[in-house]
C-alpha cells in the first residue's frame, strides 16, 4: 500500500489496531526511526498494545545480530512483526519472521529445504525508496564477512506500506544512493539470464518512473516524486525477484563493507563499466539475447544507442552527487584487487548474460574505455 494521504493513514491504523495484534515487535534503525518520525506514529497507534522496539546496530545483516534479534523475539512472543527502515532492516525483519521460533541459526540453516508452515505476520515500512526488498523472496545475510542470499517464497512480507511522510525525511545523500539502487536493479535485471517477459514488464515500469523522477527526488522533491520513486523501487524489487541482479551488484558489497560506501552508490561505481562490457561482447559475438536486451534498454530509457545511454547515466550520477571516480574516493584498485576478486558475490555474478572471469573484472575496472562510451 502506498500511503499518500490521511485517507490511507486511517486504513493503515485500522489494520494495526486489529485485536489479533496485541503484541508487536518492531525492528528498526534508531536514526531512521526518529528522523522519519515513525516513532511518533507507532507510539500513538500502538499505545494500548504491548510493543517492543529493537534498534539494529550493524550496517549489514549479520548473523550474530540476527541471532540476538531472534532471542529477543522469542522472549517477547509477539503476534506481529514490523520492519521500519531501509533494506537492512527489512532483511532482518524477513529473516527473523522466517526463522522464528528458533533462538539462533547457523550457516547450514540457509541451505535446508523448508516445508511451508504458518509464520508470524510481517508488515514492512520502507523509509527509503530503493531496495525493493518488500517485494522479494530473498534476503542478504553476512556470515564472517561473507555475503549469502537466503531465498524462500515464505520470507516475503505479508504487507508493505510506503508512508510518504516517512520517506520525506530521508537525507539527500541517502535519496541519491537508494534511488540509484532502484534504477540499477531494474536495468541489471534486464540483462539477467533469468529475465523473462514478466520481469521485463516490471523493469519497464520501474525505469519509466525512476528516470523521470530521480533527479527531482534527490534535489527538490515534492510529494509526487516520493510516490513515483517508491513505485519505481517496488517494481524494481518485483523485477529482481524473478530475474535477480548481476555483476554490478556482485562487486558492490565489497565497496560497501570495506569503504563504507552506501549500497546504491557502490553499485554506481561499476554499473556503466559492466553494461559497456556487455555491449562490447555483443559487438563481437552478435548474441541474439544481448541484441534483444539492448534494444529493450534503449527503448525504455528513450536513448538511441550505447553512447546516449552512457550520457544519460553519467548525467544522473553527476547531478545526484554520486562520485564514481575511484581515485577521488581514495580507493586503490591495485592494492585492493585481490580482496575485490575474493569478495565478489559469485551467486550474483553468475546471473550475468555472459560468463565473467577474474581477468575480465580486472580489465573492466582498469580500462577507461568501459567507464564511458560518451562519444563515437
Spans of features found by a protein language model:
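ATP/NTP phosphate-donor binding region
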Residues: 1-80
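Short, amphipathic C-terminal "tail helix"
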Residues: 333-376
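Short Gly/Thr/Asp-enriched flexible loops that form oxyanion-binding sites at enzyme active sites
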Residues: 70, 89-103, 135-138
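Glycine/serine-rich anion-binding loops at beta->alpha junctions
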Residues: 78-94, 127-133, 261
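C-terminal and late-domain segments of enzyme folds
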Residues: 172-235, 239
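Short glycine/serine/threonine-rich phosphate/pyrophosphate-binding segments
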Residues: 9-10, 34-37, 63, 88-93, ...
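A glycine/threonine-rich phosphate-anchoring loop and its flanking beta-alpha core
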Residues: 101-195, 288-289
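Gly/Pro-rich interdomain helix-loop hinge
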Residues: 257-336
